[in-house]
Amino acid sequence: MVRLHNRKEIAQRFADAIKSEYIKQIILFGSVARGDDTENSDIDILIISDEYDKIKDFVADEVIKVIFDDKEYISAQIMNTAHYNKTKNFSFLTNVQKEGVILG
């Protein structure tokens, strides 16, 4: 299968689509951010927002658009700022900070 867009471009388009006053930061992480993704890799996105209820449905709709339009899967995780700051020294978030690419 020939991919029309690379996954980093898809991630940036997704981030541009979901940017709003309710989202503080959007971070691409994982294999796509590192550049070692494979055919079966998904696109890992961490969204920092204190307004989960206001963005969850819209984010889910945009994930579905990417699945249909680009035939790629986005794994979008929403985390509030307090939880992010409290757990940023844990291994998961340490890796996100080390390898992550800020998209918005």
Positions of PLM-derived features:
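Catalytic core of pol beta-like nucleotidyltransferases
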Residues: 1-27, 33-39, 49-104
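Short beta-strand->loop micro-motif that forms the acidic, two-metal-ion catalytic signature
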Residues: 44-48
